[in-house]
Amino acid sequence: NIQMIFQDPYESLNPRWTIEDIILEPLNIHNIGNLDERGDAVVEILKTVGLTPPENYLPRYPHELSGGQRQRVSIARTLIMKPKFVVCDEPTSMLDVSIRISIMDLMLNLAKDLEVSYLYITHDLAVARYMCNRIAVMFNGKIVEIAETEELLNNPIHPYTKRLISSIPVPDPSYERKVYDINFDELDSLI
């Protein structure tokens, strides 16, 4: 019931296997369904992640796909097992900015449609705000703050969270950023 989507679609897909082989692998390993059922499941999951028509993708190899298409294959490989919980290790950080939002929207829609929950690991607070209902901030390998997304971003408590939020660049120079009184000595003492 637990699966993972890796950060780098260029490294997480076997370059010697076709897209069909890559997505079939978990079904084959766990001996799920017969050959026809497995083939049908692969076609359906490709449609689900927006790789249509599926027959155009099945015989191809990862190097023949764009970064966004590769990440869709990674998502398909993960979801073919019908997990309830997916660990997402920065699944959009290796993608072109123009593709990121479409992958994030796909993941959000799939979470609703397939009733999947994500643990979304990211260093990008803008992505966390877009993707997450709750955020946990880690400092030195420990969770130091957990809150609803907007609550954490608007009213951080831990000094590291405050420092992290204060470091986010603001594209509008006339924007007045909320200034946090950060005690750097206190933060350094936590290290």
What are these regions (language model features)?
Residues 37-56, 165-166:
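Conserved ABC ATPase "signature" region
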Residues 80-84:
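A short, proline-enriched helix->beta-strand linker immediately N-terminal to the Walker B motif
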Residues 75, 103:
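Hydrophobic anchor residue at the start of the ABC signature
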Residues 52, 148-191:
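Charged, flexible cofactor/metal-binding loops and thiol motifs
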Residues 128-130:
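A short, surface-exposed alpha-helical micro-motif characterized by mixed small hydrophobic
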Residues 60-65, 69:
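Conserved ABC ATPase signature
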